[in-house]
């Protein structure tokens, strides 16, 4: 590196050409390689050779267009190697290509072939682009960053999506912004090389072009900004949009998630986030929403089956009419509400109390409970109608239930005899009740209950402040009333007044 041949800053250095150190921007998206000398001071036509005797780069050509000419330290390092290989700088170019992975090797080979076809040089002279540590202005030597070189593999090549940085991230400044001007001498060759490189990269990297499969782990890198494909500097897409629009040049494969420093888990699926025109199926990694809103948990009315559909649900008018008919039929058949509740429990397994049947007949249950009870009562009515006139299970069930004696209707004559006896003796003995029952041809229990009810009625009729008098006392007082002593109720009225 101390020899004159390896010093890139001498104006008469014969080892450097514009094509080997010039890197295009996004508008051209290509590497070096041109028929005439670049910058504005090189040789014209096909005269720019790589022999020591030809001075392709002069001081004026080097300093003529600093915005379109960039010199890389890795290119300078090849000067000494070129001097030891017969004066040809590109003797190790194809060795670097073979050391790359298959996708980058194919892209680099395609770019080299395109440059050879469009350039009079004997080799695919495309200079290597530097890492983001190179300075914006080429004259001063760029600082040596903490980039780790990979030996024979030349991991400092930084081929587009080819090699992964093994060392710490670069600490140097980012690459300069894309340039807008190119010397006309090598623009065509650079554009051809860029197109070939982009096509080869798209063909061998389906995960970037179509987004159908994730890239290998070795294709991930963390280089922000531009990167290189076989020495050609490629910047992020220009005004043409993602993928290189009109004048956009080669497509930038820098993933925005990698620039932002996302986690490796997200970087694995970065092809889903890349801007491309091809549709791709959604990946399970991005389906972070709720599991499902349909199917088993579709919502109310969809997954829950109502036992009574809209057609079977009766209206309030139907329930009212049925309750009225049910009560009439039940009384006609001679069954009590308790009998119906017991029969429903024995026949259908649903035991209902007498209160429930009473509330159903009075329409005092909720609409839901009325709808549930209606079909059961309807079945009971059908069973009771079919068994009319013959003892069936319903009759047996009613007999097994709580026995309730029918209300006894007492004739007027019999009732008068009982009333006269009550005035004489409101609380007869058991023997007197038996004799009275025999004389009136009534059951003993009926006579006993009548006297009990009559005494309760007498208590309700007598005010609590007045001492209860027996009928004999009342009759005797009525018979001995004189004009001087008013009846007791008159005194009451006087005291009230």
UniProtKB/Swiss-Prot annotation:
Brain. GO terms for biological process: cerebral cortex radially oriented cell migration; chemical homeostasis; forebrain ventricular zone progenitor cell division; kidney development; metanephric ascending thin limb development; metanephric DCT cell differentiation; metanephric loop of Henle development; metanephric macula densa development. Residues 269-286 have a biased composition (Basic residues). Residues 133-145, 170-180 have a biased composition (Pro residues). It holds the Pfam family Pou. Keywords: Developmental protein, DNA-binding, Homeobox, Neurogenesis, Nucleus, Transcription, Transcription regulation. It comes from the Eukaryota. Disruption phenotype: Neonatal death at least 36 hours postpartum. Loss of both Pou3f3 and Pou3f2 leads to abnormal formation of the neocortex with dramatically reduced production of layer IV-II neurons and defective migration of neurons. One of its GO terms (molecular function) is HMG box domain binding. It is found in: Nucleus. PROSITE patterns: HOMEOBOX_1, HOMEOBOX_2, POU_1, POU_2, POU_3. One of its GO terms (cellular component) is nucleoplasm. Residues 465-483 have a biased composition (Polar residues). The keyword Transcription regulation applies. The keyword DNA-binding applies. Residues 32-62, 121-189, 230-316, 458-497 are annotated as: Disordered. Its main location: nucleus. PANTHER family: POU DOMAIN (PTHR11636), POU DOMAIN, CLASS 3, TRANSCRIPTION FACTOR 3 (PTHR11636:SF125). Homodimer. Belongs to the POU transcription factor family. Class-3 subfamily. Can fully replace Pou3f1 in Schwann cells of embryonic mice and rescue peripheral nervous system development in these animals, although severe defects in forebrain development are still observed. Transcription factor that acts synergistically with SOX11 and SOX4. Plays a role in neuronal development. Is implicated in an enhancer activity at the embryonic met-mesencephalic junction; the enhancer element contains the octamer motif (5'-ATTTGCAT-3'). This is POU domain, class 3, transcription factor 3. The gene is Pou3f3.
């Amino acid at each position: 590196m101390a020899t004159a041949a390896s010093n890139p800053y001498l104006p008469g250095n014969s080892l450097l050409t514009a094509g080997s150190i010039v890197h295009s921007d996004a508008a051209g998206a290509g590497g070096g390689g041109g028929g005439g000398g670049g910058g504005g001071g090189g040789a014209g036509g096909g005269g720019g050779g790589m022999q020591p005797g030809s001075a392709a780069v002069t001081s004026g050509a080097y300093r003529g267009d600093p915005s379109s000419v960039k010199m890389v330290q890795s290119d300078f390092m090849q000067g000494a190697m070129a001097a030891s290989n017969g004066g040809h700088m590109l003797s190790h170019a194809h060795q670097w290509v073979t050391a790359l992975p298959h996708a980058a090797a194919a892209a680099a080979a395609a770019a080299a072939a395109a440059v050879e076809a469009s350039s009079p040089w004997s080799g695919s002279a495309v200079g290597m682009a530097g890492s983001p540590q190179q300075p914006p202005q080429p004259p001063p030597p760029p600082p040596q960053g903490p980039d780790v070189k990979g030996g024979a593999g030349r991991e400092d090549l930084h081929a587009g999506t080819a090699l992964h940085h093994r060392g710490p991230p670069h600490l140097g400044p980012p690459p300069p912004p894309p340039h807008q001007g190119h010397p006309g001498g090598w623009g065509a060759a650079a554009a051809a090389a860029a197109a070939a490189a982009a096509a080869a990269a798209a063909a061998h990297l389906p995960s970037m072009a179509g987004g159908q499969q994730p890239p290998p782990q070795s294709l991930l890198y963390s280089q922000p900004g531009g990167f290189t494909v076989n020495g050609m500097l490629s910047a992020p897409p220009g005004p043409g949009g993602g993928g290189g629009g009109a004048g956009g040049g080669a497509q930038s494969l820098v993933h925005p998630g990698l620039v932002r420093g996302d986690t490796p888990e997200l970087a694995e699926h970065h092809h889903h986030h890349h801007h491309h025109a091809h549709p791709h199926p959604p990946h399970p990694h991005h389906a972070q929403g709720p599991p499902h809103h349909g199917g088993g948990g579709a919502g109310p009315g969809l997954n829950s089956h109502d036992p009574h559909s809209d057609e079977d649900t009766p209206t309030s008018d139907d329930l009212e009419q049925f309750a009225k008919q049910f009560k009439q039929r039940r009384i006609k058949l001679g069954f009590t509400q308790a009998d119906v509740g017991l029969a429903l429990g024995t026949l259908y397994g649903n035991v209902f109390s007498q209160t429930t049947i009473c509330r159903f007949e009075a329409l005092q249950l909720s609409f839901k409970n009325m709808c549930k009870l209606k079909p059961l009562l309807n079945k009971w009515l059908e069973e009771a109608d079919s068994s009319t006139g013959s003892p069936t299970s319903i009759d047996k069930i009613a007999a097994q239930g709580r026995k309730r004696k029918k209300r006894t209707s007492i004739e007027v004559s019999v009732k008068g005899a009982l009333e006269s006896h009550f005035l004489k003796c409101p609380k007869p003995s058991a023997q007197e009740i038996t004799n009275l029952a025999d004389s009136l041809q009534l059951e003993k229990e009926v006579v006993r209950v009548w006297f009990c009810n009559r005494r309760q009625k007498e208590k309700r009729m007598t005010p609590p402040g007045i001492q209860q008098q027996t009928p004999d006392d009342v009759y005797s007082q009525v018979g001995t009333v004189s004009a001087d002593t008013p009846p007791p109720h008159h005194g009451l009225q006087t005291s009230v007044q």
